[in-house]
């Protein structure tokens, strides 16, 4: 954990060489040294990890094996037994003993090392975390061992200060917490309380959820449950893929009635017991042979799980559907690229183009629960850059689709990019906001996407009240060409997988965006669809990553006028959380967790998490204390990043 300045016996004591430790160490002196220096990261309490693993029972333990703690890959593979000799050599030079370890320690004084080792030998053993059932062979759906969150709790998740029950907080997607313990006056005093770090070096875009003191998140193929205040692991469920995988990126779980739900990379929707971590049911709903995979966070309303696949860039023909919470049995389906006999099919002038027409789901949904209206953000058509293959407007790609949530009936749609040629997905349909405009009460829908525009719609009339740029936009009408066209935003611009936040207290919308251009090319000949291969019809070469930037905006949702704007040295793709205390919480690709003054945009606090922050950032209160959690790690192949998948939890002292 390289971000922490103090580690075992103090990383500041760096020497070239050392002598073997004495055999007759003083445990009392070692305890004093441990409490003065080592305890910054480690505890001596069995079952309680700090930034580093608990050292209770470390003598005689295999390296990298303590249940409940996620080690660096180097430590997990070290294959050591922590006897006195190995401990002495590690403390003398961790880098020499375990090359690549995140621990940085080098203590030359053999007496000091012997004292600490003597003290470690007096400590007890740590309890093992119960192993979760990882079987995927559940025959009939099982009942969960616990209950909650209930349908009513999900309905009122926006006012729940103790939990975070949907990827974007609640059905409205406002990403706002009614907590004011952390303010601009004291945010600089925030301190990291704990870290959960896995060995996964893949994409970390998950949005953790919190319910009754437990945090639930996805890491690669796993669902992990940890204590939301100590980061201690409670259980892990690992899904073993049964088929081909196009992409392993996953953006989180849903919680409902004792179940944790997620989609898997090989096309299964699964439910796991919230308390025990065992599989309750699994259902195959998508398939890589159809160019589909599952990445979005599910949404649960009543007894329905709302979900759908991604895969447009591989030539999928996508849909959104509802499944029974108790079993995964399908209830309804709406085709986001219509079949021949469905409304919208005539928007594909070449009927065969619909077979691989795209329309991915990869970001959160929004729901007007009072009216029963589901808002769906639909992604780009395929092939991405060769639109001559698919003449027409290509419904319902790059559209907001409004459905009756109980039946999947189409209520209305609004397409924002007809016959898209830039892979500019419509990515966000939240937050939902109620505002007074020109003396009239309006129910608003915030719409944004990779084209770098933010629109405000009236949900009742479907009128677009305004449209404003939120990143650099140049040459936007240019078509990809064989020689290339430089266009802003590029493939990775505008609004990505985390949407804006809205503070009803400040009546302000907060928006983090990506400012990154690229050169768009198309192939000389029309592309041919091939199973399990990208169906682009061209390519985008992003400008050098060093040129990629971001923006953080505060916007009046009633008018679209900026209250303030801050340029950022990296793209901003992490979640943003607004709070009653007047502090925004987010992160950036320079590994920083950030607390920002919501009134001015001034940075109040930053902390290097050891990995790029590109997933969820959330806040909640447990036993009267406000916490903030941020995910970190590698963001994606395009955005890059460092570190393994982790969650860092912060609070005031």
Task: Annotate each PLM feature.
Residues 272, 276-277, 318-330, 393-409, ...:
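Beta-propeller blade signature
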Residues 12-22:
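C-terminal segment of classical bacterial N-terminal signal peptides
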Residues 138-198, 232-241, 278-287, 329-337, ...:
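Aromatic (tryptophan-biased) beta-strands that constitute blades/sheets of beta-rich domains
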Residues 42-48, 60-61, 92, 121, ...:
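Detector for the c-type heme attachment site
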Residues 164-168, 202-221, 245-268, 293-317, ...:
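Repeat-blade elements of multi-bladed beta-propeller folds
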Residues 81-133, 274:
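C-terminal capping alpha-helices of c-type cytochrome domains
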Residues 24-48, 55-59:
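Sequence/structural segment immediately N-terminal to covalent heme-attachment motifs in c-type
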Residues 180-285, 579:
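N-terminal cofactor/phosphate-binding cores enriched in small/glycine residues
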């Amino acid at each position: 954990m390289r971000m922490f300045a103090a580690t075992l016996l103090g990383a500041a004591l760096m020497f070239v060489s050392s002598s073997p430790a004495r055999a007759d160490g003083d445990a009392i002196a070692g305890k004093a040294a441990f409490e003065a220096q080592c305890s910054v990261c480690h505890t001596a309490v069995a079952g309680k990890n700090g930034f580093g693993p608990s050292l209770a029972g470390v003598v005689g333990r295999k390296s990298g094996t303590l249940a409940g703690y996620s080690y660096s890959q180097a430590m997990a593979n070290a294959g050591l037994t922590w006897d006195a000799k190995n401990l002495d050599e590690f403390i003398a030079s961790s880098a020499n003993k375990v090359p690549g370890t995140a621990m940085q320690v080098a203590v030359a004084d053999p007496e000091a090392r012997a004292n600490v080792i003597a003290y470690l030998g007096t400590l007890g053993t740590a309890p093992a975390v119960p192993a979760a059932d990882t079987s995927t062979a559940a025959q009939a759906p099982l009942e969960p061992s616990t209950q909650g969150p209930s349908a009513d709790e999900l309905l009122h998740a926006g006012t729940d200060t103790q939990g975070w029950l949907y990827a974007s907080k609640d059905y409205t997607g406002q990403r706002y917490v009614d907590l004011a313990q952390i303010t601009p006056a004291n945010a600089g005093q925030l301190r990291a309380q704990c870290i959960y770090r896995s060995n996964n070096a893949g994409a970390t875009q998950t949005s953790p959820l919190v319910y009754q003191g437990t945090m639930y998140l996805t890491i690669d193929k796993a669902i992990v449950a940890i204590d939301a205040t100590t980061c201690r692991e409670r259980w892990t469920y690992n899904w073993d893929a049964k088929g081909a995988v196009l992409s392993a990126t996953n953006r989180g779980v849903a919680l409902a009635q004792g179940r944790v739900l997620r989609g898997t990379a090989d096309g299964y929707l699964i439910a796991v017991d919230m308390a025990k971590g065992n599989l309750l049911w699994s259902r195959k709903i998508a398939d890589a042979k159809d160019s589909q995979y599952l990445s979005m966070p599910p949404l649960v309303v009543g007894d329905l799980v709302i979900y759908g696949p991604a895969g447009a860039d591989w030539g999928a023909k996508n849909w959104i559907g509802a499944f029974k919470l108790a079993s995964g049995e399908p209830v309804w389906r709406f085709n986001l690229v219509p079949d021949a006999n469905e409304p919208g099919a005539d928007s594909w002038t070449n009927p065969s183009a619909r077979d691989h027409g795209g329309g991915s789901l990869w970001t959160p949904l929004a729901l007007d629960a009072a009216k029963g209206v589901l808002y769906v953000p639909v992604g780009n058509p395929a092939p991405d850059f060769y639109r001559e293959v698919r003449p027409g407007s290509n419904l319902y790609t790059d559209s907001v689709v409004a459905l009756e949530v109980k039946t999947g009936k189409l209520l209305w749609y609004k397409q924002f990019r007809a016959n898209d040629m830039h892979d500019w997905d419509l990515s966000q349909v939240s937050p939902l906001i109620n505002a007074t405009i020109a003396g009239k009460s309006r129910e608003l829908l915030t719409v944004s996407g990779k084209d770098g525009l933010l629109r405000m719609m009236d949900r009742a009339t479907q009128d677009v009240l305004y449209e404003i740029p939120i990143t650099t936009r140049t040459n936007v009408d240019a078509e990809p060409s064989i020689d290339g066209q430089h266009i802003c935003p590029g493939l990775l611009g505008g609004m990505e997988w985390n949407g804006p936040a809205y503070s009803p207290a400040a009546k302000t919308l907060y928006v983090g965006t990506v400012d990154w251009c690229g050169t768009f090319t198309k192939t000389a000949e029309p592309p041919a669809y091939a199973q399990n291969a990208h169906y682009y019809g061209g390519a985008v070469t992003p400008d050098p990553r060093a040129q990629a930037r971001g923006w953080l905006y505060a916007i009046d949702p009633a008018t679209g006028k900026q209250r303030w704007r801050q340029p950022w040295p990296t793209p901003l793709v992490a979640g943003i959380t607004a709070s009653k205390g007047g502090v925004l919480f987010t992160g950036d690709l320079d590994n920083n967790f950030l607390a920002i003054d919501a009134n001015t945009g001034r940075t109040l606090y930053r902390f290097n998490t050891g990995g790029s922050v590109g997933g969820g950032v959330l806040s909640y209160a447990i036993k009267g204390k406000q916490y903030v959690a941020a995910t970190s790690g590698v963001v994606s192949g395009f955005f890059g990043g460092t570190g393994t998948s982790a969650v860092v939890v912060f609070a005031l002292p």
